[in-house]
């Protein structure tokens, strides 16, 4: 303020206005430069945090030589997959029992379907998930549920991975279909495709026997999913479908459920105290 007073002191009002007009451009330029620098610092912080999503335990989760593209971007497509709405339709070529077959969502009408995406064949966490679900497929079938895994790899890459022994990072004989999404359309419809990375996040979708989407789980790259939790969720949704009651936190088959009305809920909460 003192500087401004010295500059304007001893001048007539008209001269003061002329001096102000001359001083405004450099002042505005200074303010714009300051704001731009703050914006760059903010972008740098964002990029640093974004890159951290791809680094784990001292190394890249999916190195550049594997994904072939920069791992700095997490851009996702707007998902068509919405809870309580019909699941986005899909069809494509899958590897089933070592053979190429055409597969589509409507093949599973009348059954529950666990439909999950994994990033890439011949990677690290992915085979552990597929093997875990495949080894326990009979538990899913016993509750009228099927499991399908999907990635952006071709059916030929799927087959090569299946033909690779497990001790070498392969799948070996696998009991669930591996669906190919080579044009990325299915991944985009389900909102799991990372545009600049060229592969998907770990998305899992539970679709009921009427084709309605009931549950979505979406993991970042470093962490695999739980077969036990997926089974529990399917069983919980099937129970509510059949009985009309609702399942509290951590519910398992045989546990108490809640009647969803003001009087009915008291039967459940009275037993807790």
Curated annotation (Swiss-Prot):
SUPFAM superfamilies to which the protein is assigned, alphabetical: Thioredoxin-like (SSF52833)
Signal peptide: 1-40
BP GO terms, sorted: cell redox homeostasis; extracellular matrix organization; hydrogen peroxide catabolic process; male gonad development; negative regulation of male germ cell proliferation; reactive oxygen species metabolic process; response to oxidative stress; spermatogenesis
Chief location bin: cytoplasm
Reaction(s) catalysed (UniProt annotation): a hydroperoxide + [thioredoxin]-dithiol = an alcohol + [thioredoxin]-disulfide + H2O
Molecular function (Gene Ontology), one example: identical protein binding
Gene Ontology CC: cytoplasm; cytosol; endoplasmic reticulum; extracellular space; smooth endoplasmic reticulum
Catalytic activity, EC: 1.11.1.24
Gene3D superfamilies xrefs: Glutaredoxin
Subcellular locations according to the entry: Cytoplasm; Endoplasmic reticulum; Secreted
Keyword list, A-Z: Antioxidant, Cytoplasm, Disulfide bond, Endoplasmic reticulum, Oxidoreductase, Peroxidase, Redox-active center, Secreted, Signal
Superkingdom per UniProt: Eukaryota
Modifications after synthesis and translation: The enzyme can be inactivated by further oxidation of the cysteine sulfenic acid (C(P)-SOH) to sulphinic acid (C(P)-SO2H) and sulphonic acid (C(P)-SO3H) instead of its condensation to a disulfide bond.
Record note on quaternary structure: Homodimer; disulfide-linked, upon oxidation. 5 homodimers assemble to form a ring-like decamer.
Leftover remarks: The active site is a conserved redox-active cysteine residue, the peroxidatic cysteine (C(P)), which makes the nucleophilic attack on the peroxide substrate. The peroxide oxidizes the C(P)-SH to cysteine sulfenic acid (C(P)-SOH), which then reacts with another cysteine residue, the resolving cysteine (C(R)), to form a disulfide bridge. The disulfide is subsequently reduced by an appropriate electron donor to complete the catalytic cycle. In this typical 2-Cys peroxiredoxin, C(R) is provided by the other dimeric subunit to form an intersubunit disulfide.
Functional description taken from the UniProt entry: Thiol-specific peroxidase that catalyzes the reduction of hydrogen peroxide and organic hydroperoxides to water and alcohols, respectively. Plays a role in cell protection against oxidative stress by detoxifying peroxides and as sensor of hydrogen peroxide-mediated signaling events. Regulates the activation of NF-kappa-B in the cytosol by a modulation of I-kappa-B-alpha phosphorylation.
UniProt family annotation: Belongs to the peroxiredoxin family. AhpC/Prx1 subfamily.
The protein's name: Peroxiredoxin-4
Gene: Prdx4
């Amino acid at each position: 303020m003192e500087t401004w007073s010295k500059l304007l002191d001893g001048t007539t009002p008209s001269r003061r206005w002329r001096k102000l007009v001359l001083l405004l451009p450099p002042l505005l330029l200074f303010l714009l430069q300051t704001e731009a620098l703050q914006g760059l610092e903010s972008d740098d912080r964002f990029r640093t945090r974004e890159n951290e999503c791809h680094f784990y335990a001292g190394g890249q989760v999916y190195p550049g030589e594997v994904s072939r593209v920069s791992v700095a971007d997490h851009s996702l497509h707007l998902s068509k997959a919405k809870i309580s709405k019909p699941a986005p339709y899909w069809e494509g070529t899958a590897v089933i029992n070592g053979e190429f077959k055409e597969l589509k969502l409507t093949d599973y009408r009348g059954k529950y379907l666990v439909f999950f995406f994994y990033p890439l064949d011949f990677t690290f966490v992915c085979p552990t998930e597929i093997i875990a679900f495949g080894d326990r497929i009979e538990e899913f079938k016993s509750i009228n549920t099927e499991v399908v895994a999907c990635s952006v790899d071709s059916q030929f890459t799927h087959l090569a991975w299946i033909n690779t022994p497990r001790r070498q990072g392969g799948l070996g004989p696998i009991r669930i279909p591996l669906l190919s999404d080579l044009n990325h359309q299915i991944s985009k419809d389900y909102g799991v495709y990372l545009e600049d990375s060229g592969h998907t996040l770990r998305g899992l979708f539970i679709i009921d026997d009427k084709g309605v989407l009931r549950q979505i789980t979406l993991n970042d790259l470093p962490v695999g999913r739980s077969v036990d939790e997926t089974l529990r969720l399917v069983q919980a949704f099937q129970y509510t479908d059949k009985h009309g009651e609702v399942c509290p936190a951590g519910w398992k088959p045989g546990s108490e459920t809640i009647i969803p009305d003001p009087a009915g809920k008291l039967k459940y909460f009275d037993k807790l105290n």
